[in-house]
């Protein structure tokens, strides 16, 4: 997940998983993610992701979607800077913490208790779609789903860890080959997009479950057409 919250519906590191007939893949299973978040009073650092703060600083505030918002640090940060924020996560435990974080600084966020695949979201409804450290099963068609949510002229920001230890990943119950990667995100967009990356960038994390990851792979894609 992240300097802040792990996106996993995509969300910010990886945790619980389930076996598919073809191997391993994470899914938007509320009970699994609730168990993950219930292990600790706070899983992530509570700070927004560095790549988000850098990229959002170049954009005029508009409508933002935080996919796999976890405990809400990115969503709250965007809201404090004038964005109209929708944030989704399959974990009710995580969303309760996210709501509390928003209330503590008196900002409004629309919280959606769902994973990406089943969430009711407007096509072309967002000027920024932010996806950090996701665990998106390729079988669910995540590239097309994410792309469909971005408004013309809008930005899709997809960030993942640069270092993936495959053996460790398999031990923790997921197969990176079955999940959307930065390379897959960039390659899958096709015409109608101006794509930068994946670009390797250092990250600095003060604490939380993602602190052992030191570099990000960042994909920034701007939708150049309305088709």
Regions found by a protein language model. Name each.
Residues 91-93:
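Conserved SAM/SAH-binding beta-strand->alpha-helix loop
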Residues 98-99:
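Conserved SAM-binding loop
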Residues 105-116:
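Conserved SAM-binding strand-loop segment of SAM-dependent methyltransferases
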Residues 121-128:
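A short acidic, Gly/Pro-enriched loop at the edge of an enzyme's catalytic core
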Residues 2-59, 62-70:
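Conserved class I S-adenosyl-L-methionine
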Residues 153-161:
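Conserved beta-strand signature within the Rossmann-like core of class I S-adenosyl-L-methionine
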Residues 141-152:
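A short glycine-rich, Lys/Arg-flanked "PGG" loop and its adjoining helix->strand segment in the class I
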């Amino acid at each position: 997940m992240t300097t802040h919250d792990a996106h996993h519906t995509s969300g910010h590191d990886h945790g619980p998983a389930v076996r598919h007939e073809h191997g391993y893949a994470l899914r938007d299973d509320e009970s699994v993610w609730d168990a993950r978040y219930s292990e600790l009073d706070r899983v992530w650092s509570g700070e927004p992701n560095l790549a988000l703060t850098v990229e959002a600083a170049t954009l005029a505030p508009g409508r933002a979607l935080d996919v796999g918002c976890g405990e809400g640090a990115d969503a709250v940060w965007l809201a404090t800077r004038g964005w109209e924020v929708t944030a989704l996560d399959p974990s009710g435990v995580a969303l309760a913490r996210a709501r509390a974080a928003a209330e503590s600084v008196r900002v409004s966020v629309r919280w959606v208790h769902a994973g990406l695949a089943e969430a009711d979201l407007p096509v072309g409804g967002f000027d920024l779609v932010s996806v950090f450290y996701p665990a998106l099963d390729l079988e669910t068609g995540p590239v097309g789903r994410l792309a469909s949510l971005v408004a013309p002229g809008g930005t899709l920001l997809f960030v993942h860890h640069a270092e993936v230890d495959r053996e460790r990943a398999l031990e923790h119950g997921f197969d990176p080959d079955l999940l959307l990667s930065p390379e897959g995100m960039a390659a899958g967009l096709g015409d109608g997009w101006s794509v930068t990356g994946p670009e390797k960038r250092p990250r600095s994390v003060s604490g939380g479950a993602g602190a052992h990851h030191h570099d990000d792979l960042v994909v920034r894609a701007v939708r150049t057409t309305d088709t």
